[in-house]
Each structure stands twice: as structure tokens, then as C-alpha cells.
Amino acid sequence: MTVKLDFEECLKDSPRFRASIELVETEVSELETRLEKLLKLGSCLLESGQHYLAAGRAFVVGICDLARLGPPEPMMAECLEKFTVSLNHKLDSHAELLDATQHTLQQQIQTLVKEGLRGFREARRDFWRGAENLEAALTHNAEVPRRRVQEAEEAGTALRTARAGYRSRALDYALQVNVIEDKRKFDIMEFVLRLVEAQATYFQQGHEELNRLAQYRKELGTQLHNLVLNSARQKRDMEQRHVLLKQKELGGEEPEPSLKEGPSGLVMEGHLFKRASNAFKTWSRRWFTIQNNQLVYQKKYKDPVTVVVDDLRLCTVKLCPDSERRFCFEVVSTSKSCFLQADSERLLQLWVSAVQSSIASAFSQAHLENSPRGPGQVSGYHAPGSAATLACGGAARGRESGGVGQVAAQVQSVDGNAQCCDCREPAPEWASINLGVTLCIQCSGIHRSLGVHFSKVRSLTLDSWEPELVKLMCELGNVIINQIYEARVEAMAVKKPGPSCSRQEKEAWIHAKYVEKKFLTKLPEIRGRRGGRGPPRGHPPVPPKPPIRPHSGIVRSKSECPSDDMGSLHPGALLFQAAGHPPSLPTMADALAHGADVNWVNVGQGNATPLIRATAANSLLACEFLLQNGANVNQADSAGRGPLHHATILGHTGLACLFLKRGADLGARDTEGRDPLTIAMETTNADIVTLLRLAKMREAEAAQGQAGDETYLDIFRDFSLMASDDPEKLSRRSHDLHTL
């Protein structure tokens, strides 16, 4: 304990004691002033803190309001929710800090001012009152004359009483001064300590809250970076679009109505003037839409649509050249007619054409819905690899007979296909279309992870299937492919995984089987053991028509090498020979498994490829198999003729249709400067001419941004089905048309 006033000096009442008293009183007075100032500053701090809390909570509410603006965005909603919750937690911690600060001020500083200093002031007042009494007693005692004995005794008694009172009060004052000195130190240090502890708690809570969001903040930063990049790209695209539209506007070009093909039929939108049916015949501008086989209009977006024609099949459209206003046309239904006006002659023609096309589309759709299915339609048709000539205007819709379940039943009926090719799980519902095998769902996922250069996976029940692809799957199958890829499994004593094996075991097996090809044997051994394969189980191919000229460079359909010598060929040559007449799909699969280049060039045969050789053999399945395994549909021979040229020269309509679906180049010319259409016209093959012209028309429409007609796809579907199910009929048809 610090002793500011010595008790001995206090009893002596020396000048040193009085000087100490004055110094202590000055210090205590200064302490009181500063403590009162600190209390005022603390009040201001607490008041400002409360204002900060109120403003912070209002700010958080404002952030929450941003999430309610516009359509909901999951990413922004999650971000705002997480951060507003975090901000609220921080504000709660700040409120706790303010409460702790206020409590500390009241408990330490305010108590010190009100209680500690009050006792000091009372002791000081008593001390100085005793000092004054002592001073008066001393003065009176000193002034009493010697002759006044009685008065002198009374003065002495009063002096002793005053001195005793003074000393008692002086000791009390000294004690109070010493106590207040220590209390000042303790209370101030405790106040600061509690304040710092409250601050530490506040910042620790904030640190924990930030740590809780650390991972999310990192992920959000990455997402925002990607969003900024995408936004920059979109901004650049919009600026380019803006420049183009501005140039178009400066060029005086009029805006075109929106024209597109959707799931509900042909759709066209744009502004037209409509003549009222009242007596005034007023004209008003409205937004018209052709959709769902209806013609409707509305004034504002929120207004309900008004139906002009409920069913486009029950109306017609005609021009109004006699009308007083220009660019008018009339839509006439069974119950009423509607006069409409476009902004220009070109827009008039577009609208009339759109209405006519919509009427035709409505009739076509009704016909397709009511028409019975043909018995030969065993599968859906979908051309995932179609060229631009077929792909524009939407993907081809599948044509199915009895549903895609019939495809699964047909493929699974092949010997060995009722079980998964790799793990023997029953009833597989997936397939690898370039390998020709069926797979369970787990093995199909592993095959998909290998990449399409190893395996192209398709569902037997969920996807649409081309008829030629279904026949290809039935021609190959698990037994044949496993004879190739598992030829040495027994000799190597390798255990094949079963249905109950883990995914890791199946994945290791599939990787070793198809990627590393550990179980393949040498070509001569495979050929000797399996003995090759005769003609496919489909219809025998029709003998090819002779080429246009003897030096045309067409690959001869007759095999140049005896079958006994095929085992000695390298894989590319083996693939080439196996694609000839009659093609052997197992041998082709064998060659591809041993690394044959699907686009291998036979220099001795005029740079012909296996696909060109299969074309000469008129084998739809061989061509489909090669295309599924990456054959180039536009690779030409030394005469500059690709597969489409050869199919056209030989009159193989089904193959020409297949190559067009797979993106064959319509404008490719041979060394004589002839494209496929020129050759087809020279050979007077009407079917191929029709296909080529339809493809060219579709290509031209796609270049102009127009949606195509379903007629194109219907014709290609019909030719595909005919080539797959009845190739002899297609050949006779081509021959009959050729001889007319």
C-alpha cells in the first residue's frame, strides 16, 4: 500500500505535512476532474455505439432487401443470407461489447467518483474544520493574560480538546488519503483490464465468425472470378451485337418479326396494325403471335391475350390488294375475318408465309399423330451425328414403333446380350454402339469415363435408335466381341469380375480389356481359332452397279486376297479387306481391336479407305460400323471421290442417305470437277438426286437462319428405314427409276 501521508508527520502537524496535504488535495481534485471527463466520454462512446448498432442493423436489412429484388438467384440469395447472418452476429457481439463497457464504467469509475471521493471530501472537510478550531484555540490560549488564572485554565482545557480533535481528524484524513490513493490505482487498472477483456471477447467472436465463412468466401471468390470473365465475354458479345444492330438501323433496315421453331410448332411474333370490327374501322397496333396452332395478340405484356384464330387448320390467309391501306392481308376463319397491316412489303410476305406455314404445320402434326405405325419401324430414329444440312431447325425427332423398349428386347435377344458384356449382370439396359456390346449401368459409367474414342455409350431404353444401328448391334453382340477382347483370359488364368464385384474391380477389368488390351491374341491365332466369319446375318448385299467409267477408281467388290491369307495382313490391311464384299463385321472388329487405322489408305487401290471399300460392297452395316468408330465420311481417294461420290456412282441410295446424315460434304468435287449431285443427275438416279437436293435446300435455309420443314427429316427417315429393313426394295426402286 502506498503511504502518501505519514501518521507521525500528521501528529506533528509540521509544514512538511501541510505541504503534503496541499499536494494530495491538488492531485485528488485533478483526479476527480479527469474521472468526470472520462465518464462523459464514456457516455458519448456508448451513445455513438448505439447509433452504430442501429445503423448497422438497418444496413443489414437493406442488404436483405436486395435479395428480394427481381427474380430469385440461388447464388446471390445464398451469398446475401450467409453474409447478413454473419453481420448480425457481429452486431450482436458489438452490442455485448457496449454493455460490458457500460457496466465497467458504472462499476469502477462511477463508483470511485461517487463513493471513494465522497469519503475523501468529508474527511477533508472535518480535517480543516479541526485545523481551524485548533488554530483558534491556540490563538485564544496565547492571548489570555497571566493574571486571569480562571480564563487561562479554561483556554488550556479548550486547547487540549481542540488539539485532540484535530489530531483525530488529521489521522482520519491521512488514512482516507492513503486509502483513496490505492483505490484509485486498483479501480482504474481493473477498469482498463475489464475493458480490454471485453474487446478481446468481441474480436475473438468476430474471428470465429470469419473463420466459419472462410471456405465459403474462398469458393465465392472463385465463382465471382468466373462470373466476371463470363460477364466480360457477354459484354463483348453485346457490344458487337449493339454495333451490328446500330449499323443495321443506320442502314435503314426495318426490324424483322421473331421467327423460330419451338416444341409447340412454328412461332412468329411481331407488331401488326389490326382493323377494328366496329363501325369506325379504326386501326390499332398490337403484338401478334403465332403459337400452338393459334393466332393471338395483346397490347401490353401483362394484358391477357386475345385469340384471333383458335385453330389455324380452320382458316386461310389472303392478300388485300384493293384495300386503301398498303401491305394489308386478311385472315379468314369459319366465324370471322381479321384485317391486318404490316409495315412493309417484305414483312407482309413474311407474315403471309408464316401463317401459311403454320397452317401446313398444323395439318402435318395432326396427320403424324393420327397415322398408324408401319410394321418395319423397329426403332426410333435420331441422328446425333447429322451434318448441318440435317441439323438446322432442331434435332430429328425419333420415330418409334411400340416404344424404345422394343429396341432393348431386340438387342438383348442376341446370343450373349442378355448379360452385361463385362460383369455378366442380367438384363443390361445400356450399350456401347461402337463396340457392339450390351452393358449394365455401372459398367456403362466406367465405359463412359474411358472417352468416346474407346466406347460410345447409349441407353437401350432412354435414347432413340437408328434402324441401321439396331441391326449393327444385333450383328455383333457380346459373344463375338468377347472372343476378340477376352481371347487369352483362360490361358492367362484371369478371373473375370461378376455382378457383385466392386466398382474398382470392374474398372480395373474394363481398363485392362479395352484400353491396355491385355487379353488380345495375335491376329493369325485369332483367325485360326475363330475361323473368320461369313456374310452377316442380314440380307445379302445387292451386287454393286458398274462404275460410270472403267478408270473411275472405284474399289472392286471382289476380295483381292483369299480368306486364308487375311490372317497374315497387318491390322489396317485386314480392316480394308474385311470391309469388302462380302464384309465381315467380326473381322473388322478384330482388326480395330488390334489397332487398325479406321481411315487406313490402300495406296495400291487408288488411296481407297475401308469406308470406300464398304461402300463398294453396298454394306450399310459395315459403313455404319466404320462411322461409329471414327471413319472420315469426307476422306477421298486418288480420284478425289469420297464415300458419297462412290455411293452416288453405284446407285446405293441407302448409303448416300447415311453419309448425308453423317455430314458428308455436298460440294466436294472429284478430279473431274463433279460433285455428287452432278454424278447423280448423270446417272439419272432420282432418289439420290432428291436426297441431295433436299440436303442442299436445308443447307441453304440454315445459312439464312430459317427453320426447316419436317418433310426433310421424314424423307430421310423413310430412306433409312428402307435401307435397313428392305434394301432389296430400295435397290429395285433405284434400278426401276434408273431405267425409266
UniProtKB/Swiss-Prot annotation:
One of its GO terms (cellular component) is recycling endosome membrane. ANK repeats lie at residues 606-635, 639-668, 672-702. GO terms for molecular function: GTPase activator activity; zinc ion binding. Residues 405-740 are annotated as: Required for interaction with GULP1. Signal peptide: none annotated. InterPro entries: ACAP1/2/3-like (IPR045258), AH/BAR_dom_sf (IPR027267), Ankyrin_rpt (IPR002110), Ankyrin_rpt-contain_sf (IPR036770), ARFGAP/RecO (IPR037278), ArfGAP_dom (IPR001164), ArfGAP_dom_sf (IPR038508), BAR_dom (IPR004148). Residues 537-549 have a biased composition (Pro residues). Residues 525-566 are annotated as: Prevents interaction with ITGB1 when S-554 is not phosphorylated. Transmembrane segments: none annotated. Residues 1-382 are annotated as: Required for formation of endosomal tubules when overexpressed with PIP5K1C. Its main location: membrane. SUPFAM superfamilies: Ankyrin repeat, ArfGap/RecO-like zinc finger, BAR/IMD domain-like, PH domain-like. Banana-shaped homodimer laterally assembling into tetramers, the tetramers further pack helically onto the membrane. Interacts with GTP-bound ARF6. Interacts with third cytoplasmic loop of SLC2A4/GLUT4. Interacts with CLTC. Interacts with GULP1. Forms a complex with GDP-bound ARF6 and GULP1. Interacts with ITGB1; required for ITGB1 recycling. This is Arf-GAP with coiled-coil, ANK repeat and PH domain-containing protein 1. It comes from Mus musculus (Mouse).
